[in-house]
Amino acid sequence: MSELFEEVEVEAYVYPTEDIEKVKKAMLNLIPDLEFEAFDRGDYIILTAKTRSRKALSRLYELFRGQAILDTARSFLEEGYFGEEIIIKVNKQAAYAGVVNFNEESPLGPITIIIRTKDPQRLMKWLAPRTKDGVPIE
């Protein structure tokens, strides 16, 4: 069976009022095994991280089910699907608390997750299958 994805990249802006370690923790709460790079842009820092770990999406998989948000997650995955990339944006403060919230509207900006995959339909079916009455049907 081929891999579900090639790479996961995560990005967030870190503003002067924020603690970069807390932003890293927020990112790691969603995607484990990240390797970070920071780029200082003066007024803010761009924090990026990548992983090719097979476990990279395991936390999102668990959170989507634990929070009973498979249908919502599926719609955001489909909305962010472009060719061989799926891009979703989540609330940074919610991620710090270990929760997925797709309302990225925040003065601090979102965490952007980019999933690179050769088979986006298969990945979406695994990560956030369609449901009926809250039960996965695919």
UniProtKB/Swiss-Prot annotation:
Protein name per the record: UPF0201 protein TK1335
Highest taxon of the lineage: Archaea
A Pfam entry, by short name: RNA_binding
Family (UniProt): Belongs to the UPF0201 family.
Species of provenance: Thermococcus kodakarensis (strain ATCC BAA-918 / JCM 12380 / KOD1) (Pyrococcus kodakaraensis (strain KOD1))
InterPro entries membership: PAB1135-like, Ribosomal_uL5_dom_sf
